[in-house]
Amino acid sequence: LTRAAWPALVDSGRGRIQVLVSMSGKRSKGSLAGYTASKFALMGLCQTMRNEGWENGIRVTAVCPGWVNTRMAAGVKTMPPEQMTQPEDLASLCAHLLTLPSAAVPFECAVNASLER
C-alpha cells in the first residue's frame, strides 16, 4: 500500500505514514524469533521510508504497542484483557499523531500496557 501511495505523496510534497509495528520491533522477549525478526525488519523499513521521504515532507511514525486486547492476544495468560491497551485507545493515539505539525511528528511511539522489564 505504501509503495503504491509513495509517488503521490512525493508529488504532493507532504504526507504521513503510520505503521503498526509492535514492541517486538524494539526488543526481543520470549522465544518467538520469527515474529521478532519480522518486526525488527519492519522498523528498518520505517527508518528507510523516513530517510527517503524526509526531504519531500513525508513523515513516518512506527507505532509500537505491547499487548492490545484483540483476538491475537486472546490466549495471553499473563495479563487480563482489561489491562491491555484497548484497540480504540490505539486508534485515538494514531488519530492524534496525525494532528501534529510536521516538525513534531515522532518517528517511534511506544505504547506500553504494563511496565517493561
PLM features: residue spans?
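A short helix-coil junction within the Rossmann-fold of NAD(P)-dependent oxidoreductases
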Residues: 4-13
